Amino acid sequence: MDGCSAASTFLTDSLELELGTEWCKPPCFSCAFDNREGKFSGESYLASGALKRLILNLDPLPTNFEEDTVELFGFQWVTETALVYSCRELFHLFRQQIFNLESLVQVSCDFGKIATLHAKADSIRQQCVVFLHYIKVFIFRCLKVQEAESHSRPAHPYEALEAQLPSMLVDELRGLLLYIGHLAALPSVTVGAFVNQNQMKLFPPSWHLLHLYLDTHWLVLEILHILGEKLKQVVYGRQFIGQAGDNLTNVSLFEEHCEHLFCDLICLSLNRFDKVMPSEALLISHCPCSCVKELWVLLIHLLDHRRKWSVADSFWNWLNKLLRTLFEKSSDQRRSSVSLTQAKDPLGFSWWISVHVASLYQIDRHGVSDKMKQMESNWSFIEELLKRSVTVQDSILEEQLRMHLHCCLTLCDFWEPNISVVTILWEYYSKNLNSSFSISWLPLKGLTNIIKSPLSMLTLVRNCCSDKQDPDLYKSSSSYIIFLCILAKVVKKAMRTSGPHPWKQVKGRIYSKFHQKRMEELTEVGLQNFFSLFLLLAAVAEIEDVASHVLDLLRFLRPASMSSHGALVWKGQMAFLLMYAQKNLDIGVWAEKLSCEFQEKAKEFLVSKNDEMVQRHALWTLLCIYIDGVQEVFETSSCLYPSHEHLLNDGFSMLLPACRESELRTVLNFLQAVLARIRSVHQQLCQELQRENVDLTVQSSLSAKERPLAAVAGALWRHFFSFLKSQRMTQVVPLSQLADAAADFTLLAVDMPNTAPPDLQPQPVISIIQLFGWDDIIWPQVVARYLSHLLQNSTVYEALSQSSCVSSQSLTIRSWVRCVLQMHIKHLSDPDLLIDVNPEQAVEKEYMEQLAEMTRLLFTLSEVKSVFSKAQIEQLPSPDDPKQALIQFLEAVGVTYRTLQTFSDKSAMVTKSLEYLGEVLKYIKPYLGKKVSSAGLQLTYGIMGILVKSWAHIFATSKAQKLLFRIIDCLLLPHTVLQQDKELPGPMLTAIQKTLPLYLQGICIVCCQSQNPNAYLNQLLRNVIEQYIGRFLPTSPCVSDLGQHPVLLALRNPASVPSMTPLRKHTVHAIRKSYLEFKGSSPPPRLASVLAFVLQLFKDTEMGACDLELLLPGILKCLVLVNEPQVKKLATENLQCMVQTCQVGSEGGPATQLTSLFRQFIQDYGMQYSYQVYSILETVATLNQHVVIQLIPTLTQSLKDSELKWGLGRNIAQREAYSRLLSGLGQVGQGEKQRLEK
């Protein structure tokens, strides 16, 4: 069967396909397949080619009923005579089979019986369908037309019976139709079979019965049509009369059956329409299944075919005639032959079924959808529906009107244009322009009561003009918007087919409704509808004519309307300006009008007071409309005209100073968009000029386009750049936008340098970078963002490399150094409570990201790469940590300097290094004031400490030493440190404690590297040590707590520092001078902690004889004069360390120096503190007898001098104490002891 149906699809309209003799299953209605693609079953009348054969008057089934006999209802019949001899019997059997099928419907259809019932029902249906097809074939092949002369001769009995067959068929077909009744009158269980879905393809008897009824209704029409085509005359029935009481004929039966079939189909559709929401009207079909849809298509093709060759009604006439009866007030007024159910909403139903039936015209004779097919229209009836829809007396609701117009819009898409439709609708909407056309319970998606912007106005118009219809149009648009869609579609179609005449008709109708009184009556909603209408007309027709008329009409608006609806009027006018730009037309007229109005409002905004919030808000609303609209104009225009310059007038110069921060953001966003567009257009022109084979005419044209571009650029320099320049040191302008706008102007100067103002000439790029990138007084947030924009633009640095500014990279590096150092400058505060906060957390994430980006780009500079390369650092630092990257860069600079050999190279490197730093102390000065930032101080002291240490060799030069002196004075020896009554702030002291070793080591290296001794530098180093030894001493004199003392950390002689001798020397001097100096017999403060520090100093460093000479007298003095146990203990430990440094037997050097120191000690304290002296020397003797033995003469002489002084003879107690000392000194001591006893 599939092969036959497929083949029949390709039958030509003039030839009948010669098929084999294989029996093909006759076509029938079937929805037992997946029809989601909209295709019909291969068994259908359309797909099988049955409809085409019917219309072309071809053999209905050329491969069937070819045998001598045919099986009908289980019996064998002679094919060529069965219908003549047994017509009534066959129809009786047919009705009996229908009865049998109806009986099966009554049987309970459970799952166990479904297969059996399906098989029986399907067999009955097939027998009935085969019989009806047999009638068609018999009429076409076997029925002979009775000629006139045959009535004069005696007829053969068969001929006599054959002559009666047509009348008998008419009677039997009428009887069959009466027997099966109307589809609409079927029991609900049978009608419910339409929606039966069964994946197993097993259907209940009700499904088969329903589809057999459909087959019967359609095949009766086929039989009557074939009968009429065969006989070419009217056939009268003998048993029945027609509905009008006249004789029944094949023609009247056909018409009667058509009417009944239409009624049935309409009733089935009415049942579905009652469940359809207005918003779903176009989504839900009127057909319960594909078989009903096919029946509609069959009727369309058959009735329209008959209309071509006879006076019969077309399909639309049949449908219109019956739908009109729905509007009759009572069933009494309807024709008795029409049995239609009373519709709840006849108007809505008529729209709904009309649009769905119209779509079926796209389906051809084979059941294939062809959207390009010319469709038969039904505008006369649709016009009637439109008039009913917009009749005020009927009070049609908006939700209903939307559905009606949505259907109308779809029909406009199907059919040829009809200006009358627009005329009818405009008559209604012209009277209701002030209506919002809204549905209270349904908010419009994407559409507020008042359009938000000019661009949204154009977007609305563009959507209305789109050929693609929005499936959600009902919910997203009002009925007025749908009317605009209809207007656009009709006018566009009509102008394509008929030229400008339809547009002139529409224009006349619409223009005539607007006059001064009407314009004055428009509310805000009305004005919005007014602009939407005329924007749409401008989009589809003559924009200049429409725009000119709009300008004339706007003059009719009263001043009160302009003040209350000014924003909407501005939006509408700006929308026209945008449309001109989109169509690449000269915007001169609109630009001049709008720019003048903008200038006036900007002046009012400038002089308005800050407390006049309502007025300012109203003015700002208008100004925003202008700004947004002009931005769209520039972004939309493919080329710029001289009139574009008018849009950038003095109004901006007045507006900018009056703006607050949020308002400035809006204006600067506009500025950046316009700058980007100008540069884009300029680059396009340059590319076109650079093409090969450009003739002089084209060059002249491109040059002409360049002139208005330069004029627009000049306007931006005048009105915007001067303001940015004046605000670059303030925080009035948002910093990020200030940087972005300045970068955009820099790029504009690169592309179009001649447009820059005179004060930036002759090198505008360098001048702007100097203002916003290299100037130390600009906020670092601005500099970082600004330079990041430029560093990633190769064109900028090409311009810089060609300029006379040879140190551009050095200046950029200097700016980067400042940006890193000042990353915490915005977080200064009086009470700094963030000492332990992670420094990175104290910086805005945005600025850290910007710094990281700037660092990444900076490391691409050739100068930076060269520094790292010479320092033999292959892996560049990670830009994600700008602080660490700066540290590594500074260290690399120091390493690079140390690798240089010649004096000239070193001198140049020192100069370059100082350029990198610039006024570095000014960068960090904010952290050192009254307002502090712990994170900022930690950053400052850390990086500057690294700088001092890693650049020590550079600071050893005369060029750089001044900076080192200033660093020491500013960071380590500020005035607060030198004032005894003032304490350093806690965060500063913490930062110094962490970084002091770096400074001390660096200064020490400088001292070692200096070619000439620098007394001032040495004095500074000693002052630093003096100030901070005591400040960082622990509260308890515990040696273990002194391990992290910054001075001791510095003295631990790291491998990177060759010699710590100067540092140790100055440390010892500082201790001797400031921490071991007694005032009379009063010990210095915190003596125990100082002694602990000295003890740790001896352990950590290699002390020399000169160090002993300075420290030992003070230690000995402590042992003599202080009785505090902790002091004595620590002093003793110090004494032991000092003695241990002088090994026994050493000749000269430390041992001799030590002996000399003790001899002086004995002379100073021997007479008054003899017992303490002897005790101290006993301790020394346990470590180094040799030293004490050398002191025996001095001790003996001191003893005698003491006794002589007191004049009391021998001092027995003192001599005993001295004897104890001598007892521990071996033979020498014993000998001295004996001499004393004599």
Curated annotation (Swiss-Prot):
Main location: nucleus
Domain of life (superkingdom): Eukaryota
Localization per Swiss-Prot or TrEMBL: Nucleus; Chromosome
Keywords on record: Chromatin regulator, Chromosome, DNA damage, DNA repair, DNA-binding, Nucleus
UniProt keyword Nucleus, yes or no: yes
Keyword match Nucleotide-binding: no
A single Gene Ontology CC term: site of double-strand break
Modification note: Degraded by the ubiquitin-proteasome system upon replication stress.
Record GO biological process: chromatin organization; double-strand break repair via homologous recombination; protein localization to chromatin; replication fork processing
GO molecular function: single-stranded DNA binding
Function of the protein: Component of the MMS22L-TONSL complex, a complex that promotes homologous recombination-mediated repair of double-strand breaks (DSBs) at stalled or collapsed replication forks. The MMS22L-TONSL complex is required to maintain genome integrity during DNA replication. It mediates the assembly of RAD51 filaments on single-stranded DNA (ssDNA): the MMS22L-TONSL complex is recruited to DSBs following histone replacement by histone chaperones and eviction of the replication protein A complex (RPA/RP-A) from DSBs.
Record family assignment: Belongs to the MMS22 family. MMS22L subfamily.
Name of the protein described by the UniProt record: Protein MMS22-like
